[in-house]
Amino acid sequence: MNIHEYQAKAVLREFGVPVSHGYPIFKASEAEAAAKQLGGPVWVVKSQIHAGGRGKGKFKEASAGDKGGVRLAKSIDEVKDYAQQMLHATLVTVQTGPAGKQVNRLYVEEGSEIDKEFYLSLLVDRATSRISFVVSTEGGMSIEDVAHDTPEKIVSFTVDPATGIMAHHGRAVANTLGLKGEQAKQAESLVTKLYTAFLAKDMEMLEINPLVLTKQGDLKCLDAKMSFDGNALYRHADIQALRDETEEDAKEIEASKYDLNYVTLDGTIGCMVNGAGLAMATMDIIKLYGMTPANFLDVGGGASKEKVTAAFKIITADPNVKGILINIFGGIMKCDIIAEGVVAAVKEVGLDVPLVVRLEGTNVEAGKKIIKHSGLNVLPADNLDDAAQKIVNAVKQVA
């Protein structure tokens, strides 16, 4: 789960991490009060969306002006003007895709006098099963670009969970960033606080870009991006309360209500499969035969008729879906349950695209019988290869 920048900074503030003061606003009329509360003389007005590249982004609407999603204001009137322009406008960045995202909230923050910009992040390194620090002197820009152009400017190290964070980790960050004396001590303290927050809140990623050294000689987190382990949210009600569903895919939200593993993709063939491995294999073979999947959907091992019906409805709600492939290998999952769910869903929502069903495993004959006698226009398949070819050919014929 992701949260907004201003929410991430509030979390960091709980752990004593130095961040700039600011106020979120949801209406343009709130901008003046926020600016006056901060005092000035310089403010930063930041679009709050779940995507990076906001500063270099562009708004679709001409009324939003030609500046990016992060703007420097030198007067209260300028703060008010920016709020009026940016709120409810559509911001397009390198991470939003061409559709962009609507800006429904802004963060008005005090300006900072910046001497140097750095990059610092923590993430779960799956290769080592440890928390990894990624550090660079090249802050305020895309770390992907730095990794591509000057990889030698990125340093990373992992933390042994048996020892936890230690003083030498902080010194490693300070040395990488070229910090000495008082600034080195600040870096050591910051590293400990960030690691503590990362563990305490079950984060998957914490990115500070940029981490700045101000002209007053202080380290400050000027931006913050966080994502959390969804499986751990049950023990973090405070974090779960920060969820902004308007930033998420509506189909993925609906799928989560039924404990379905669903991810929207940009293809045209909807997939319903049980098991993540089989789901990925199904997506691969669709690609092999020249088309692309519209989603990843794993209904799990013990899905009920209602769960299968919900899954089918979610797939058909996607206007990009031109065909559907259901691929079930029944172990714990029974093929007749899948068949009943599919039939119920089709009768409820209708079927305007080709549907191929491949069933194998527990109660397979009963499942095939249910499909056969349903009166629905369903193409049966004997195996995965057969199923993929049939759905691809069927979609091409319709097109």
Swiss-Prot record:
GO terms for molecular function: ATP binding; magnesium ion binding; succinate-CoA ligase (ADP-forming) activity; succinate-CoA ligase (GDP-forming) activity. It catalyses: succinate + ATP + CoA = succinyl-CoA + ADP + phosphate; GTP + succinate + CoA = succinyl-CoA + GDP + phosphate. GO terms for biological process: succinyl-CoA metabolic process; tricarboxylic acid cycle. Its cofactor is Mg(2+). Succinyl-CoA synthetase functions in the citric acid cycle (TCA), coupling the hydrolysis of succinyl-CoA to the synthesis of either ATP or GTP and thus represents the only step of substrate-level phosphorylation in the TCA. The beta subunit provides nucleotide specificity of the enzyme and binds the substrate succinate, while the binding sites for coenzyme A and phosphate are found in the alpha subunit. Substrate binds at N274, G331, I332, M333. It is an enzyme of class 6 (ligase). Heterotetramer of two alpha and two beta subunits. Mg(2+) binds at N209, D223. The keyword Lipid biosynthesis does not apply. GO terms for cellular component: cytosol; succinate-CoA ligase complex. Keywords: ATP-binding, Ligase, Magnesium, Metal-binding, Nucleotide-binding, Tricarboxylic acid cycle. Belongs to the succinate/malate CoA ligase beta subunit family. Pathway: Carbohydrate metabolism; tricarboxylic acid cycle; succinate from succinyl-CoA (ligase route): step 1/1. The keyword Nucleotide-binding applies. ATP binds at K46, G53, R54, G55, E109, S112, E117. Binds 1 Mg(2+) ion per subunit. It comes from Rhodopseudomonas palustris (strain BisB5). The gene is sucC. Residues 9-254 form the ATP-grasp domain. This is Succinate--CoA ligase [ADP-forming] subunit beta. Its EC number is 6.2.1.5. It comes from the Bacteria.
